């Protein structure tokens, strides 16, 4: 075998395996050629299909790279079709992903599955949209979650900087288009025109091409063999022929300069190697060609980086231009320019006026300052636009950083012969990457080897099947052996964006970044983020306020114009310039009123609040993926949390165990004697048990037993050792597996790497939640051995023997085993219970030997593997290990805070009841009235029982992801706002279904993260409390700003309107420039100040708001109205009676001073009211947390300083004059009075205001009872078929009895048996008798549990104190402190605590006998 062309390594024991036979390069003459997808523009597209001489092959693609739908006229051959099924990432009973290879036949044209992409016949299997590119106008492409199928999903609120008319290929000189046109990106050019001089909008709207054309790719691949586009086209469409043309996998590896087993040759600086010392290129096997010596940078230059090009950010100038394009501002700008022109003409084109006063008794010229107002308005507009644009620019930068953080993740690769963890962006073409369950494949690749790898490609291609991956050689063999009419099934292609459902394997990367399948789709889907629910609410409110403000402005303009026309008659002496100036003043004041009334700061406030919140949340290990989730968490009522890693530290360590059955080992036995259940005294001791320290385990186990124990741990594991960021070696993988590997390392047994490399693996059984176990079959000389590890109570049932150790330490070299007996089974059960009650996770390790493979009497399934059920029996138990996962610090306090905030916490865990209840009791989750139940039982409940149990269910043990999803669905149907944590691939549906999904940042799979809204980067439950706090902080910030702005709006509109209409000169007491300054204060400055308050724990002191709660609460409404009325009264009194109150004469100087005083009082009322609006509750301390918010302090000082400068030096620009000490004193007193008035409002009872608002129909009646949705009401009575029939009969009975009975909801007509409206005959009523009896019996028997005999599942008979988790199947537990009169006791036939005559212990330190069981 040539050294330059190493063969792929295929692990198989089947002599007929396709891997052991070479495939001919051409198919047999009698074989039907494999149908191929015709690429638009390629030579093949001009010719006919091999089997379609007329050129009407139904499998051809249309010229625009889209599939012809059946019956479209392009496809004369009938096409098979089936209902399209929405993609599902899970394999539950309700999943759309199934393992089936059923083919369509004329007799069965609708198969259960669609194998479109796999056999290259998309429309023959209803895969019409498999390769259809997403249209950029499709609303779904803008969805923040629904289309998030890959690594680069983005919710940044920026416009699309890419049009992707042609896919980009990274070359040595930069990004270029694949057709070899100019190297610049035409999509970024604005205003480009076609030959007719029109902008090419049509081209911009077309979706990007779904295919690449290698013939137009001018990229020079030297030193590699293949161009980037040619490699990318291997998977789009999947083409085994194209792969064969480049030499198959061996030719591909040779062309890329990579070893199929040891990966790329790199130096030690390319990542964290498994052993810290990857081999150099000189040590690597392979060729000596230039491609073998190419650097990583060279690979990136040719094939690109695994990172999508950054979207073009809007510059500050562009944001300013977009802000200035507001129609109202444009109108105001036009008016300001006209005013400036008239002012300049007045000042420069006309002689100055001569005025006489005390200072100028002989007369002097009036100052030429008419131009100042126009300039001031222009400057004010510029400031408003500039400040708003800077805010948007800063917000965009924050979201950009957030997206960069969110897109960051690690992947496992093989480089230099060692496994290492690198950043996903560092993956290059040629890398050998590892596949693991739950991973979202980040790049395109070709499968090399693996065990039972199945992928869900529905999210990437619409393919609804779970597709198993095979090696290239197996695919070639299948193709060459196809009979006429058969289609290719086996697939070796891996598509980016697909999800690994199960299995482990390796693949070589062939396309990354924008050239990958998913990369091109993600580039096409780029767009602005959707608005959050709160933004939508505020936009509606802002639109309403703007309409009212616009109506006020229009009404003011009409009123002033009427006065203007009247004065044309009554005062004809005015010059034309005066008339024009007066008209412009009317227009300016009306437009300015509209500017002030339009609350453009409302959307800004929520955006700023979200931007600041998400930035600070990221620093606190909360990565927000969907902005709306922040708002939703504010009103969360239930949190369904995992146990492992969320409530506990997820740093598992083996602290106790049982070697065989009798040898109980404990870590640090002298300090932890209570962790051994051996010789615990009379009534608890088990004959033959003995304890020893874990460090002495090698003294009690023979060398053969040590080897067996070590192999059971090391071979049956996917974890490995790696260097962390600090350069220290640690284990990477499942926490349970890493704990066992660390245990083996502490025992100083042979290194796991050596053990794995020496093992010849025949079959692997990956872990699944259904099996609750994982295993591996290895060949040992002429025999085969199965190693299994998993849940102890599950695997113990499958064992019939156990290893034997002796207390005296005498041992030989052989492994001694013995049969199970009744005492042994009881011992194992009590050991499991003992460990579980100490919150230890129990893992059993066992093995079984076979003489041949497959074993006699068994057959391999369709996947060429022996079924698990056929071999997982009659095993020998090696050991049961107790793994400790201590509680995270502060978890109990966090649970208490949730409960204080009105958020119920429910634990959903896969652990047994005893462990789950112990942890829940320590955390404070299991409280009086709480219910404990197992997942299988909860799943079997009727809808009505589930609705009754769900609110009180606190622990759902042994639950599957489907159970968690069902619980979430039930809670949501009851109107709860549900948050859910998840870390596994199968948690995806529950995370999607929940109102807010939390994924684990450390232990979570990529599928879980992709389905989530928020990622807990440190997997801690405490961060869920932080999310609630920040969510309420965002909502509170927006409400604070809303309370402030509406009061300013009302005051400004009333004062301006009344003073302008009452003025003889059509002038408002607040000029246009002054109103623009007020607008700047109430929109931008207030949004920055009030939307940046940090989250505080005081927000947890209240219950969550209802879903239909109004945006403006009664307290807010009360404060808004009182403050607005106070400010209107003060300002209007000063305006109309100020001269008399202050004892001033009526002249121009005093009027100007009075106008400045009114303006100053108005502004300082807003400044002090801004302080007042920092609180929404009835507490009086408005300065709480004031000194912690630097934004508020700085903006408060800017507003005060700016107002002082305006009054003191603003002069003619703001039409004010300097104020004396008395006036400043009046200003500060009037402004500061807002604070005591606010305190008085808070002390005023809310009841009268609430009743008034209800009578005015502004608010809904809070005393009105909530109603169930029609769906929930129907489900309420569908739990028992007998009672459904009773309901039908009661409906009939109500026709005769009527009245009171008819008022009951029980008499609603059943959807199961609708009755006619005709009269019912009396004999029909007799049907009530049997159905009522049946209903009573059915309801009573619904919870009856059959008697369990003594055995492993129930070793103590009916005594629950000594029961394993198996005992609780079909049972319900209540907390011992539950009220004895609780109706659940009677409903489920439970025995209240005191009736048993036993004392009731507290929730803490609960023993297995403290709970009530059925």
UniProtKB/Swiss-Prot annotation:
Short name of any one Pfam family annotated for the protein: E1-E2_ATPase
GO cellular component terms, A-Z: plasma membrane; vacuolar membrane
Amino acid composition bias (Low complexity), ranges on this chain: 33-53, 75-96
Residue spans, topological domain Cytoplasmic: 1-327, 392-541, 607-1040, 1090-1118, 1172-1191, 1245-1414
SMART domains given in the database record: Cation_ATPase_N
Binding positions (ATP): 644, 737, 779, 909-911, 958, 964, 986
UniProt region (Disordered), positions on chain: 1-231, 265-294, 1376-1414
Residue sites binding Ca(2+) 2 per the record: 1049, 1083, 1208
PROSITE patterns: ATPASE_E1_E2 (PS00154)
Presence of keyword Chloroplast: no
GO MF terms, alphabetically ordered: ATP binding; ATP hydrolysis activity; metal ion binding; P-type calcium transporter activity
Disruption phenotype: Increases cytosolic free calcium level. Resistance to cadmium. Decreases cell population growth in serum. Sensitive to calcium. Abnormal level of calcineurin-mediated signaling pathway gene RNA, transepithelial migration gene RNA, and antioxidant gene RNA. Decreases VCX1 RNA level and increases ECA1 RNA level during cellular response to calcium. Decreases urease activity. Avirulence in a mouse systemic model of infection; decreases lung fungal burden and abolishes brain fungal burden.
Family named by the database record: Belongs to the cation transport ATPase (P-type) (TC 3.A.3) family.
Function: This magnesium-dependent enzyme catalyzes the hydrolysis of ATP coupled with the transport of calcium. Transports calcium to the vacuole and participates in the control of cytosolic free calcium.
Name the record gives this protein: Calcium-transporting ATPase 2
